[in-house]
């Protein structure tokens, strides 16, 4: 998923019987944890440095109590620290001010408040969405003045929680006027890598020095970025997939570039003309053998699997044949398996600047998900379904289930559509449980990622705050 914050902010103007998940070999392996991140599976929007959208924490599995955090803010970024407190990066409805909230995920329901809040300087509406928790539970984020911030939470003498921001580096000198950072991730050496909308990529060293390069003209970065234990950092632009690394000379360098089919135009349900994927590291040997994205080819789209380190195309497979041919979401990747959800036709109420017209201008949201496995013969489609996923799916290796929120209603969407917490068996793609959530358009997650907490709750950002299941 890319830049859900502005899209969410703009939108602010029954348990079903099923079969239990089938017994299967454990999912994995996952890449080793990044030592400069917080708890694995909960420290980045997509769970980890490799953007796997996989967690080793068990989710609610079935029906549970639903509580709400009504924050009057759109909240796409939900992260949990080692202290079991949640840090949320949101956009306030009033003024669209980026705001950091500190939350207790176990607060009594049905309504809960934040423990502390800290507004950030507003800049480009496209910046400041992706952030992460570092190894001491500080939120690392870039504000509207291009400052790299570290935000810690602490209690004062009265026991009141507060959020404290410290500037670590200024990225302004390496960014063009009007540009904004769209992705952040640490590598395994402690460098903080970033990528900007206008195609600047680089890193900040542990000492605060900034080094950057400019990707080819006309290529924009509309997703976050990912890193692997090998030291490689993956960046997907609107034209190509890259791996970068820090050279011995102390500057970023391109390891390889692989163009993909970006199609002839932006598709309805996507936010830019190109892939909607944050690159996902996965693989059967190290957990980061491969990289995967979904292309934007006209008509049928494809999962592309490339080898990390070389950029060799391992295989490609057509996906989302049962639903809409396009995905704004990052794939889920674990072991030999990739899971993709369609967003084709999803009714985003606003688009980022420069998104361009969609062709066709609109389409029904039919949904659909696909699982693809990589084996010695290439890519193989294991299953497809018609689940209308309205969030980035999250796979739990602890309980062997795939979690999302589904949109409920006709394919031609309306503000009266509902939403359902939905659990799937990743072996078959079958829905094992679903629970309707309260509300209609105000509870639209708009294809943002959920958080599974250490206590087994699932938190999902919405247009006006956060819902908690379990």
For every predicted segment, state its role.
Residues 2-8, 12-120, 126-129, 135-138, ...:
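Sequence/structural signature of beta-propeller modules
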Residues 70-80, 119-135, 172-185, 218-229, ...:
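Repeated scaffold domains used in trafficking and secretory/extracellular systems
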Residues 86-88, 138-142, 191-195, 232-235, ...:
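Conserved beta-propeller blade signature
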Residues 90, 289-295, 328-440:
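Loop/turn-rich, solvent-exposed surfaces of beta-rich toroidal or solenoidal domains
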Residues 93-104, 145-157, 198-205, 239-245, ...:
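Structural motif
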Residues 114-123, 162-177, 253-272, 316-324, ...:
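Surface-exposed loop and turn segments in beta-propeller and other repeat-based domains
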Residues 115-127, 145-147, 152-189, 196, ...:
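Asp-box/WD-like beta-propeller blade repeats and closely related beta-sheet repeat scaffolds
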Residues 444-470:
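Blade-level signature of beta-propeller repeat domains, shared across WD40, Kelch, NHL, RCC1
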């Amino acid at each position: 998923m890319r830049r859900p914050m502005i899209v969410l902010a703009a939108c602010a103007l029954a348990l079903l019987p099923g079969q239990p998940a089938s017994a299967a070999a454990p999912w994995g392996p996952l890449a080793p944890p990044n030592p400069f991140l917080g708890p694995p599976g909960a420290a980045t929007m997509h769970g980890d440095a490799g953007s796997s959208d996989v967690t080793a924490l068990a989710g609610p599995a079935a029906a549970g109590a639903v509580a709400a955090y009504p924050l009057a803010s759109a909240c796409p970024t939900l992260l949990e620290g080692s202290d079991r407190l949640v840090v949320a990066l949101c956009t306030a409805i009033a003024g669209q001010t980026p705001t950091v909230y500190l939350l207790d995920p176990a607060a009594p329901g049905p309504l809960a408040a934040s423990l502390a809040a800290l507004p950030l300087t507003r800049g480009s509406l496209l910046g400041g969405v992706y952030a992460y928790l570092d190894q001491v539970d500080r939120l690392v984020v870039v504000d509207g003045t291009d400052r790299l911030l570290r935000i810690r939470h602490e209690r004062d003498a009265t026991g009141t929680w507060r959020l404290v921001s410290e500037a670590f580096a200024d990225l302004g000198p390496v960014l063009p006027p009007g540009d904004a950072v769209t992705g952040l991730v640490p590598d395994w050496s402690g460098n903080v890598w970033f990528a900007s909308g206008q195609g600047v990529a680089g890193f900040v060293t542990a000492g605060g020095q900034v080094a950057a390069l400019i990707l080819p003209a006309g290529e924009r970065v509309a997703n976050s970025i990912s890193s692997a234990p090998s030291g490689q950092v993956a960046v997907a632009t609107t034209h190509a997939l890259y791996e970068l690394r820090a050279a011995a000379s102390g500057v970023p360098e391109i390891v390889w570039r692989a163009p993909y089919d970006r199609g002839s135009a932006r598709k309805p349900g996507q936010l830019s003309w190109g892939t909607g994927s944050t690159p996902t590291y996965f693989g059967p040997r190290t957990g980061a053998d491969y990289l995967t994205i979904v292309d934007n080819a006209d008509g049928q789209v494809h999962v592309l699997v490339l080898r990390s380190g070389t950029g060799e195309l391992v295989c490609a497979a057509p996906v989302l044949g049962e639903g809409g041919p396009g995905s704004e979401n990052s794939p889920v990747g674990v072991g030999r398996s990739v899971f993709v959800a369609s967003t084709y036709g999803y009714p985003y109420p606003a688009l980022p600047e420069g998104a361009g017209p969609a062709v066709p201008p609109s389409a029904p949201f039919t949904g659909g998900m696909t699982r693809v496995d990589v084996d010695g013969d290439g890519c193989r489609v294991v299953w497809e379904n018609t689940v209308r996923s309205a969030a980035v799916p999250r796979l739990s290796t602890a309980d062997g289930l795939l979690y999302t929120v589904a949109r409920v209603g006709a394919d031609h969407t309306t503000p009266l559509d509902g939403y359902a917490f939905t659990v799937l068996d990743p072996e078959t793609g079958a829905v094992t449980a679903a629970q309707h959530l309260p509300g209609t358009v105000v509870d639209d997650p708009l294809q943002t990622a959920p958080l599974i907490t250490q206590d087994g709750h699932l938190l999902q950002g919405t247009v006006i705050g956060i819902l908690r299941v379990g």
